[in-house]
Amino acid sequence: MLKIGVVLFTLLVLFPLATLQLDADQPVERYAENKQDLNPNERMKMIMSALGQRRCCISPACHEECYCC
């Protein structure tokens, strides 16, 4: 009887809990999907700002996001 109870508890309670998707996982997945939709210029801008690097700009168009070449 005890073995049947353990098997039923495992199948009816523990197995469904292990297969549920956590709510904390979903925003990360959505965030990654949103990043794939960016155009290459926006993606490069985000990567460069994260690395703390700036691009080289041609002299009349210099601004804070890049340095003059």
UniProtKB/Swiss-Prot annotation:
Pfam families: Conotoxin
Domain of life: Eukaryota
Name listed for the protein in its UniProt record: Conotoxin Lt3.3
Swiss-Prot/TrEMBL domain comment: The cysteine framework is III (CC-C-C-CC). Classified in the M-1 branch, since 1 residue stands between the fourth and the fifth cysteine residues.
Tissue expression pattern: Expressed by the venom duct.
Propeptide residues, chain positions: 25-53
Paired cysteines (S-S): 56-68, 57-66, 62-69
Subcellular localization, as worded in the UniProt entry: Secreted
Recorded family membership: Belongs to the conotoxin M superfamily.
Organism: Conus litteratus (Lettered cone)
Gene Ontology molecular function: ion channel inhibitor activity; toxin activity
One GO CC term, this protein: extracellular region
UniProtKB keywords: Cleavage on pair of basic residues, Disulfide bond, Secreted, Signal, Toxin
Record carries keyword Signal: yes
First and last residue of the signal peptide: 1-24
